[in-house]
């Protein structure tokens, strides 16, 4: 007997965590069902050969005519992201509304009396608008690339200093095109919070810039988990303890998917601690220097000797930009990786940055182009310590045995509230 089909339809699903989430909270198998063209989506919907599905970009509006019954909230929003097949009849719902409301609430973002700027005009825009409107927002502005209709151009939106909350509903900054950003939060002196519905990476460039401004910044991962839990209630017809399940699943999966990036002085034990930590956390270990050597075909001392430090830093930045896009890794970085702000931002996007500190006299300096010991090493430490402080989110004192260091690193990771 064929198993009932549960899954997610959308144009591109390579970035999706939905399968992991649904199979964590329910007992059905959940499939990712990419439908690159509208013709394929039309055929899929006409066949109705599924028990229940979620719907993502670009089909949240496309699927509405195929639903026999559309929930009033989904109808008013004009977007459906959850469809349940009950005896051949399709029922459409919108759980993104409750998911986004959860995200805002859990981070203390209150729309009442606020001026809100929403980036993008796609299907998620209408959902976010509804939540902001129902939350009592004073004014809701929209910005887009084209500025059509009532929307501002992004350049025009930058001249609204009264904006207090920004919500990104576009795919800008989403994997694999990380690093992209539509506006600069620094342009908004009254800014209090930035929310981004993008969930991969955990922190988009927009959110990293918002964090640098000292305002509340939250990505879409908790929204993703919340809407999945609410969708599961529709799928199964059972009420769940959402108040307990959503934060528990969010935290568990973030720990499973997060990277741990390790920085520190040359010879402080980054690779040794990193390899052991990766084993303990069941994550892939990446030694960034070894990866640079693998990709360039040259060892690092030779790169420094033959091409100079600037050339090495370019190789390092290129390799790191690709590696940091991944998930569930422990990344041991070279000692000078923090010299580039772009590098530290790449490390921050998917997890904590762990600064390994070790007494200067205990550093291993053999085969390291920039750390020869003595006065030069002291000077290097003095130059880099402020950079390590600025780049790191947690600090590990590596003064004892390897086992002690790894135990401490695991504890820091598991108790990191910023994760």
Model-derived segments and their meaning:
Residues 2-107, 201-203, 213-216, 220-225:
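Phosphate/diphosphate ligand-binding glycine-rich loop within oxidoreductases
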Residues 10, 92-97, 104, 109, ...:
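Glycine-rich adenosine-cofactor-binding loop
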Residues 134-152, 289-296:
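NAD(P)-binding Rossmann-fold cofactor-contacting core
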Residues 150-218, 337-343:
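Rossmann-like adenosine-cofactor binding region
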Residues 197-258, 398:
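Adenosine-phosphate binding glycine-rich loop
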Residues 244-255, 276, 280, 326, ...:
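NTP-dependent small-molecule kinase module
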Residues 290-348:
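ATP-dependent small-molecule kinase phosphotransfer cores
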Residues 349-387:
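A glycine- and Lys/Arg-enriched "phosphate-lid" helix/loop adjacent to the NTP-binding pocket
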């Amino acid at each position: 007997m064929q198993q009932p089909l549960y899954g997610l339809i959308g144009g591109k699903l390579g970035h999706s965590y939905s399968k992991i989430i649904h199979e964590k909270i329910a007992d059905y198998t959940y499939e990712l069902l990419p439908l690159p063209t509208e013709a394929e989506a039309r055929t899929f919907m006409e066949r109705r050969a599924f028990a229940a599905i979620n719907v993502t970009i670009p089909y949240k509006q496309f699927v509405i005519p195929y639903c026999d019954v559309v929930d009033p909230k989904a109808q008013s929003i004009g977007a459906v992201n959850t469809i349940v097949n009950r005896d051949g009849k399709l029922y459409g719902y919108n759980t993104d509304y409750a998911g986004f409301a959860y995200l805002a609430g859990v981070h203390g973002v209150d729309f009442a009396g606020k001026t809100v700027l929403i980036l993008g005009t796609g299907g998620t825009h209408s959902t976010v608008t509804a939540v902001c409107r129902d939350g009592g927002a004073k004014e809701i502005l929209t910005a887009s690339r084209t500025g059509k209709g009532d929307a501002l151009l992004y350049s025009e939106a930058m001249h609204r200093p009264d904006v207090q909350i920004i919500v990104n509903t576009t795919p800008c900054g989403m994997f694999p095109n990380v690093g992209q950003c539509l506006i600069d939060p620094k342009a908004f002196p009254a800014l209090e919070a930035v929310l981004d519905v993008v969930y991969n990476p955990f922190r988009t460039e927009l959110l990293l810039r918002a964090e640098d401004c000292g305002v509340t910044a939250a990505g879409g991962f908790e929204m993703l988990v919340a809407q999945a839990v609410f969708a599961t209630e529709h799928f199964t017809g059972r009420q769940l303890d959402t108040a307990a399940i959503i934060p528990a699943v969010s935290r568990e999966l973030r720990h499973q998917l997060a990277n741990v990036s390790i920085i520190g002085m040359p010879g402080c034990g980054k690779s040794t601690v990193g390899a052991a930590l990766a084993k303990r956390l069941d994550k892939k270990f990446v030694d960034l220097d070894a990866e640079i050597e693998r990709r360039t075909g040259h060892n690092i001392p030779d790169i420094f000797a033959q091409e100079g430090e600037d050339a090495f830093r370019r190789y390092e930045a290129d390799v790191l930009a690709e590696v940091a896009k991944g998930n569930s890794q422990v990344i041991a970085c070279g000692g000078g990786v923090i010299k580039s702000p772009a590098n530290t931002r790449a490390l921050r996007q998917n997890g904590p940055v762990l600064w390994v500190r070790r007494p200067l006299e205990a550093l291993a300096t053999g085969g390291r182009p920039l750390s020869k010991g003595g006065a030069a090493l002291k000077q290097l430490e003095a130059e880099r310590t402020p950079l390590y402080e600025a780049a790191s989110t947690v600090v590990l004192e590596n003064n004892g045995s390897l086992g002690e260091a790894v135990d401490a690193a695991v504890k820091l990771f598991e108790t990191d509230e910023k994760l």
